[in-house]
Amino acid sequence: MIKAPILQSLLASRDDLTHNPEVNNFGGKEQECLYLLKRCHNIDEFKQVHARFIKLSLFYSSSFSASSVLAKCAHSGWENSMNYAASIFRGIDDPCTFDFNTMIRGYVNVMSFEEALCFYNEMMQRGNEPDNFTYPCLLKACTRLKSIREGKQIHGQVFKLGLEADVFVQNSLINMYGRCGEMELSSAVFEKLESKTAASWSSMVSARAGMGMWSECLLLFRGMCSETNLKAEESGMVSALLACANTGALNLGMSIHGFLLRNISELNIIVQTSLVDMYVKCGCLDKALHIFQKMEKRNNLTYSAMISGLALHGEGESALRMFSKMIKEGLEPDHVVYVSVLNACSHSGLVKEGRRVFAEMLKEGKVEPTAEHYGCLVDLLGRAGLLEEALETIQSIPIEKNDVIWRTFLSQCRVRQNIELGQIAAQELLKLSSHNPGDYLLISNLYSQGQMWDDVARTRTEIAIKGLKQTPGFSIVELKGKTHRFVSQDRSHPKCKEIYKMLHQMEWQLKFEGYSPDLTQILLNVDEEEKKERLKGHSQKVAIAFGLLYTPPGSIIKIARNLRMCSDCHTYTKKISMIYEREIVVRDRNRFHLFKGGTCSCKDYW
């Protein structure tokens, strides 16, 4: 007779068990308990069912029952379920490979990757032989920990056990090596595959996306689509959309969207969020909003993508309204959402509103402010020209002041040409022994503004000694599905001669509009004429010349940049949009700029 109220409710609809005389034999008892196990919806129900397994001597006499109980708990996702699962595991006299796999998978699911590796070590010490279900989860743990050493050791064990031909293991190896930066090893595993499946290609694409290798990611994706009849898996599609978002490859992103609509009846929230992110970063805010509004369910990542997108387009007030909508829907803002909202305030000059959001975050107490949040606050004040207040904020921060905070402050000091405060930030940044080449370049540029040429030379010498390499600034234009990449003073393009002829024509036209180059943007100790020549060849100007030549008359010229544009390029582009009567959209590292009729959507606040 079952007396516990929870168990009675679980069995309420199962008359075939409660009234069946055979339920008293061993098989019947086990069937009853396994049925109860499936119906558990929380840890309290589960504990009562677990107790019943023990009371009926099923847990210790049936390995199948013990493994089922363990798997239900470990894979449930309930709060603290893995702690309870660990106690269940210790109660099993002779755990089998399935039980170890259950624990490894459970720990990986809750992101306790070190625990997963510990269980694998215990498994090997006890003599349990891993199987093809063991390694995908284990390699995922190595991937998330960036533990290439352990990953290579596990690869060796995979080889010894003859599991290297298993498709799931192969794809996990490709992903692990790729995301740990070992691209050659990732490619080597891929090339050895006898049959390259959609999953293998998707693993290659995802690995490149995980390392921010956007161009390589898209090359692989295009290769898969053109050289095979395979259709990428969801993970590959999401990675390709991420790459499109980061390179401004709108046409390819739209093609992927079309493919998804034709082949998948209902897009899940991950894919829909990826589409929102792709469209906002490719300059199509209306399309992103359309997808967002049609979504039946939205999560924090969806709102974060939309709020960040509105911020990119200078729609700070709309971003704040979106934030309010999220709260009304009952979602609790997390770390990522607050960063997005604070960035939106920063890029729209909403100082009062940004302070209010930050104060509310502190008051709520559900999100502990990190260096990233404080960095947003410093950026908000710095962009508004409140550098003294920004420094006071930094000095009052209750957490360790890391490179993010000082880099943000230094960047705003350089923009505002405040050498005195900038030197304070530079000194603090150098104390942190930064190995970020961008930091040294920022410091060097600050010294250049102050004509402190000895300090410039010393900083650049340090860059050389440390072997640091700065990624050069570039601008990208997409034309007929192909991306054209330009760097400063670029003469590598096949149409170089025509492009520079166009640049010369543009320069001639600008003289009649009163354009005067801002020589302060060339931070080198060279004469005035040399500075003018260097300004002419900035990558954005070369990209605009290409766009004017080869895009249809009257169409919008779209440019994606990897760095913030300089003030001279900003002024230059405003005037070109008026002279040639063309809309020019530029996405730099911080936001979108829509140049039209001699003005910019950022209202000169960027």
UniProtKB/Swiss-Prot annotation:
Coiled coil: none annotated. Keywords: Repeat. Disulfide bonds: none annotated. One of its GO terms (molecular function) is zinc ion binding. The keyword Transmembrane helix does not apply. It comes from the Eukaryota. Pfam families: DYW_deaminase, E_motif, Eplus_motif, PPR, PPR_2. Residues 481-511 are annotated as: Type E(+) motif. GO terms for biological process: RNA modification. Residues 512-606 are annotated as: Type DYW motif. InterPro entries: DYW_dom, E_motif, Eplus_motif, Pentatricopeptide_rpt, PPR_At4g14850-like_plant, TPR-like_helical_dom_sf. PPR repeats lie at residues 96-130, 131-165, 166-200, 201-227, 233-263, 268-298, 299-333, 334-368, 370-404. Residues 405-480 are annotated as: Type E motif. The keyword Ribosomal protein does not apply. Belongs to the PPR family. PCMP-H subfamily. This is Pentatricopeptide repeat-containing protein At1g31920.
